Every structure is written in C-alpha cells, then in structure tokens.
Amino acid sequence: LDPESPPATWDEFVAAGKKLTKKSGDSVDQWGAMIPSTGYPYWMFGALAMQNGQTLMNGDGNMTHFDKPATIEALEFWKSLGSDHGIMPEGTIEWGTLRQNFLEEKTAIMWHSTGNLTTVKKNAKFDFGVAMLPAQKRRGTPTGGGNFYIFKDTSAEEQAASLKLIKFLTQPARTGEWSMKTGYLGTGPEAYNTKALQDYVKAFPPAAVARDQLEFATAELSTYQTGRVRKMLDDAIQSALVGSKSPAEALGDAQSKADRLLKRYR
C-alpha cells in the first residue's frame, strides 16, 4: 500500500482494509478500519449515503429519504465491512473510544471528527495521514459544528455582552487558533487567510484535508423534530449492524416513523 495514495473508492477502501487487517490465529490484532456507530451514527451514515448519491432529507426538513434504494445500499455496505469483508468488528463500535483504538493501533483506519486531529497529532507514536472519505457514486461528507445563540428573553445588557463575546470568538484569528488547537475547521475562509493558520497548514498539510473536503459536503441530517428523527435513524442503523433487522427492514421502519412525525409539517 502507498500511504500517499489513500483509498479513493469504496472498493479500494475494502481492498486496503483487507491488507491492513492483522490476525493471530482467530483473533484480530489490528482491524483494517473502524467507523463509529454509537454517539452519532446518523452523522457517519450521512457520509455513506451521500457517497452513494443520496441525501437523508429534503431541503425543507419535512421529509426523510431513509428507505430510498441508495440509502439502503449504503447501510448494506456499512454492515458488509464487518459481516462480509471482515475488515471491521461486527456490531457497534464506540464513538468515545475509537480515537484511543487508533492511537493504540487497534485499527489502521478510523472515520472520525476532524476535531480529533490535534490530539492524534500530539499523541500518535507513529506516522499517520489524513484522507478524504472514499467515493462510490461521488465523494460525500456531512458538515458538523455548533451554534452561538442570544436569547431574546434576556436583558439588553446581557445581549450586548453576548454579542461582544460572539464577535470575539468568531474573529478569523480566534477561529484559526481554535482550528490549530483542536483540529476543527476554521469557521470561515478568512481564518485560512491568517498567517498563523497558513503557516500551520504548510507545516502540517493534514490540517487542510477537512477544509478541502467541504467541496463534497452535504448538510447533516436536520429536520423538524430533529432530535427524534435522528434517534429513529440511529436506532435503525444499530439494529442493522447488530443483525436484529436487515438494512431494508430497519430503514423502512425508521422511514415510517419519520413520516408519521413529519407529515404535519408538509
């Protein structure tokens, strides 16, 4: 394998995973890859679905696409990485311990938030790289992140103070610093025009991979009643990965539940 030529397609990802899986008898010393399926399964799945040419919801946020053929194919592929190809543990994989599994070389590849990058950089005792996620019909990744809010039922003084803090935290110099110290993206292109972040990216090119991957990004799953809808999809993904339902059955059930919840918003 050429570490400077990471897998660019699903087929290449599987092939690389097989070469990277190391066994001692019946036990696995190092898995080829791990994709977390607790914490934010819907988020990881948004990448796989988009790579297969399918979004998880419409632009109005009142209809989901969980039972579309391309969505089902994406979940079948995810499950097959463990059940058929043997490059990933079967069942669920913990979000919270995956980074440590990578640092301990229990998996050769991990799919995870770019917010782990600086911690991995500081703690990895081996050379590592960062690559864009592989494509099937196209490349795809979900966006992530959080928000600042100012509540209307607060005093004018509190609102002014909140706005002052938000303006400070969102200055290009601050978001660039935040990116370097965490691995998260700078929250605007201006951050990447600061000398500090430009110098950092020049010295550590992996810091620019997630930024460059935005070209292929889709919005993360967001609908009316988002929390409930995400839970429906999370449960469906996990039930398929552990084998209690087929991907088609699990996603069909999730779609029916989401339809009942979202029809009032159409």
Can you name each region flagged by the protein language model?
Residues 8-14, 89-104:
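Short helix-initiation/N-cap motifs at beta->coil->alpha
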Residues 72, 76, 80-89, 121-185, ...:
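Extracytoplasmic/periplasmic substrate-recognition and gating elements
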Residues 108-113, 129:
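Paired acidic/hydrophobic, glycine-rich loop segments that form the ligand-binding mouth/hinge
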Residues 14-21, 60-91:
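Glycine-centered hinge/linker elements that transmit conformational signals in sensory
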Residues 131, 180-232, 239, 265:
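Long, aromatic- and glycine/proline-rich binding clefts that accommodate carbohydrate-like moieties
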Residues 95, 112-117, 134, 146:
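Beta->alpha turn/N-cap motifs
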Residues 11-64, 107:
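Extracytoplasmic/periplasmic solute-binding protein
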Residues 21-37, 171-182, 261-266:
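Bilobed periplasmic-binding protein-like "clamshell/Venus-flytrap" ligand-binding domains
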